[in-house]
């Protein structure tokens, strides 16, 4: 069984795929601090970098749970997978380590109503076969609205906390903003406020869509099937 694990179910295992220049690793390091310092959970993080550094891909491996985490290896069976760059779906097997029923969060430049047709066929099949809970947000649109250019790190971090439920939503937002102030405070209040605005926008249900994929009704993939159903972020099942 490729998804067999000796780790207890109480350990949340999350993978984040990003680029060296998009701030994903920095945001995940902040998330570890938030989870480890502000909850009863223990937290662990490993970070894998492509040799090209800036502009190349990064993979963040985060674990957290109610007991000390002793695992000293990379995650091969994840309950949460986030892809912060749509183009990585063609380059990496992003969902290989996703457990059946896991959450998949995707930053997509396409509207939720179109994103299914834009996915590589293999990714469509994995979502169906593994019955993944699929969420999509246009992080770049939110970043642009907040005046942050291409920096999506705090936006995707907010989505992670909104979906994972590791902290109550408002408490998570408060902790994220505190981390933002510590991280970006030296750059000036304008930078801090732009990040705050991005967090406030990303937490809104209208931004983060849960695609209710009709598993079992899908017969033909990519190009012949347009996923019809989107909803505001409500239940995660």
What is each residue range found by the language model?
Residues 1-11:
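A short, basic/flexible loop-to-alpha-helix module at the beginning of a structural domain
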Residues 10-20, 25-237:
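Active-site cofactor/cluster-binding pocket
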């Amino acid at each position: 069984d490729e998804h067999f694990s000796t780790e207890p179910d109480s350990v949340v295992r999350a993978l984040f795929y990003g680029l060296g220049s998009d701030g994903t690793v920095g945001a995940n390091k902040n998330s570890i601090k938030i989870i480890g310092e502000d909850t009863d959970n223990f937290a662990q993080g490993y970070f894998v970098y492509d040799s090209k550094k800036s502009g190349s891909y990064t993979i963040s491996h985060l674990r957290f749970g109610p007991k000390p985490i002793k695992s000293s290896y990379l995650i091969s069976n994840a309950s949460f997978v986030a892809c912060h760059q749509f183009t990585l779906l063609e380059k990496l097997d992003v969902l290989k380590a996703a457990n059946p029923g896991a959450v998949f969060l995707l930053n997509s430049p396409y509207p939720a109503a179109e994103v299914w047709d834009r996915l590589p066929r293999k990714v469509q099949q994995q979502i169906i076969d593994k019955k993944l809970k699929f969420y999509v947000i246009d992080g770049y649109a939110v970043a642009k609205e907040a005046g942050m250019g291409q920096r999506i790190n705090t936006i995707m971090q907010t989505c992670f906390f909104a979906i994972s439920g590791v902290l109550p939503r408002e408490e998570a937002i408060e902790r994220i903003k505190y981390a933002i102030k510590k991280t970006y405070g030296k750059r000036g209040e304008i930078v801090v406020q732009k990040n705050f605005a991005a967090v406030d926008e990303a937490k809104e249900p209208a931004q983060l869509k849960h695609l209710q994929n009709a598993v079992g009704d899908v017969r033909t993939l990519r190009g012949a099937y347009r996923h019809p159903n989107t909803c505001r972020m409500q239940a995660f099942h």
